[in-house]
């Protein structure tokens, strides 16, 4: 038996979210085919073209989000809570396309979501300078965006960096997580993990994905397992701060 679910639920379990009753540590993780690399982008009409201008802005940037538990909302809350960026989060949109349309219509200044889809949604607006990518909320700098600063580098303390990693970066990395049933024999688990990884690195598979404009940016089952374990090892004080930042206010 195999399953795929939104890895953000793992953080939800750590935070004690109602309705998330399964112990995520009991699942066996096969891997992730593509990680989300979250960035924040703003329309030029916002008057903010880079993160330094954002820090200095007396007007909060109006960002669109879907709902709590979705990266569009959670990342906005996390960068506001850890970096102190002025943000007004507007939630209730049904998808990132709705957010894009609202930003293009002037209802929003911008949003934070996966670069893998944001660069397609604004494929003309970004090169034209109508939309500026101002922040990367990622574990490492994206090759496409060498001059865009990372949130981790702007954080002023180890605690802020840990909060960003646990509340924004790790959930995005494991958002499409493949699992199998608990307590399967270790030998079988290793076979499944190797097959999963082999598929995602197969030259023909990668070539077909590229033709279809599908990004392949995998994590192994072992890497996912470590990420999950790290989330469950967070201290009660950090979990409390995460819950406070991500709470609807």
Question: Where are the predicted features?
Answer:
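Hinge/capping helix and adjacent helix->loop/strand transition within the periplasmic-binding protein
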Residues: 1, 7-98, 102-105, 155-163, ...
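Short beta-strand and adjacent tight-turn residues that come in two discontinuous sequence segments
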Residues: 4-5, 92, 112-114, 136, ...
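Ligand-binding "clamshell"
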Residues: 14-28, 85-87, 120-136, 144-161, ...
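Short helices/loops that flank or line small-molecule/ion binding pockets
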Residues: 78, 82, 97-111, 116, ...
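Residue-level detector of anion-binding/catalytic polar loops
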Residues: 86, 109, 215
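An extracytoplasmic/periplasmic, membrane-proximal ligand-sensing/linker region
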Residues: 129-130, 134, 154-156, 183-249
């Amino acid at each position: 038996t195999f399953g795929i679910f939104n890895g953000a639920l793992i953080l939800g379990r750590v935070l004690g979210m109602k309705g998330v009753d399964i112990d995520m540590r009991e699942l066996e993780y096969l891997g992730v085919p593509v990680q989300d690399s979250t960035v924040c982008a703003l329309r030029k009409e916002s008057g903010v073209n880079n993160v330094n201008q954002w820090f200095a802005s007396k007007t909060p940037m109006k960002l669109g989000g879907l709902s709590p538990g979705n990266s569009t909302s959670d990342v906005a809350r996390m960068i506001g809570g850890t970096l102190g960026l002025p943000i007004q989060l507007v939630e209730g949109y049904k998808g990132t396309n709705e957010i894009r349309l609202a930003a293009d219509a002037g209802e929003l200044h911008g949003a934070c979501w996966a670069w893998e889809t944001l660069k397609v949604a604004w494929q003309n607006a970004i090169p034209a300078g109508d939309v500026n990518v101002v922040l990367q909320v990622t574990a490492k700098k994206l090759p496409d965006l060498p001059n865009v600063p990372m949130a981790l580098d702007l954080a002023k303390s180890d605690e802020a960096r840990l909060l960003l990693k646990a509340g924004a970066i790790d959930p995005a990395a494991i958002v499409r997580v493949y699992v199998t049933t608990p307590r399967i024999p270790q030998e079988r688990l290793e076979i499944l993990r190797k097959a999963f990884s082999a598929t995602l690195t197969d030259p023909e598979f990668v070539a077909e994905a590229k033709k279809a404009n599908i990004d392949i940016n995998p994590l192994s089952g072992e890497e996912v397992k470590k990420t999950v374990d790290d989330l469950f090892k967070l201290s009660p004080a950090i979990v409390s701060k995460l819950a406070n930042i991500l709470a609807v206010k």
